[in-house]
Design a protein with these regions (language model features):
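Conserved thiamine diphosphate
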Residues: 1-28
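Thiamine diphosphate
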Residues: 30-180
Length: 180
């Protein structure tokens, strides 16, 4: 997915489930002034994950505080919710969001990030140049108090991994919290 970010004006959707795939497909077809791409998993998707609310262009999947903002990309939404539960069990307030559209970067997401101590992206792309890197760059302002971290499957050449492998590779709640 990181290579798509260099295409000027591109719109890239990463649906989290079948429901958002249908919705984002309709939105992609309506884009007439730029290229659009929908990135979906090759495996079957899990159950639909309903949003609590939509803030601008961002779906909020869970909200219990502003210590950590977990930004889940695509089908990793359920894993983000599981990680949030683990953090909440340790007394850490978490907001889990799905940006829906990876590119262009959502101003709404950048504003959400500014109100959290730590921002963690959960994605299955490469270490460099992915969505997490783009979000960290967008959030890097002189007045920002948020720290950004990424959780990815692997660093190196483009390969594929199962969702279970991505979860095993993700940072533990303890290591994530220490990063703050």
């Amino acid at each position: 997915m990181s290579i798509l970010g260099v295409i000027p004006g591109i719109h890239v959707a990463a649906p989290r489930d079948a429901g958002t795939l249908a919705e984002e497909l309709r939105e992609a077809v309506a884009i007439s002034d730029a290229p659009s791409v929908i990135r979906y998993p090759k495996a079957s998707v899990g159950a639909d994950l309903p949003a609590l609310e939509r803030v601008g262009s961002v779906d909020v999947l869970r909200r219990s505080g502003t210590d950590v903002l977990l930004v889940t990309v695509g089908a990793l939404g359920e894993l983000g919710l599981e990680a949030a539960q683990r953090l909440e069990d340790q007394g850490i307030g978490v907001t889990v969001v799905d940006p829906r559209w990876i590119y262009p970067m959502s101003v709404d997401l950048v504003e959400m990030a500014a109100s959290h101590r730590l921002v963690v992206t959960v994605e299955d792309g490469g270490r460099h140049g992915g969505f997490g890197s783009a979000l960290a760059a967008a959030c890097a302002t002189p007045t920002s108090r948020s720290r950004c971290a990424t959780s990815r499957c692997r660093n190196g050449s483009t390969t594929t991994a199962s969702v279970e492998r991505c979860w095993r590779c993700a940072a533990s709640p303890r290591r994530t919290w220490r990063a703050a």
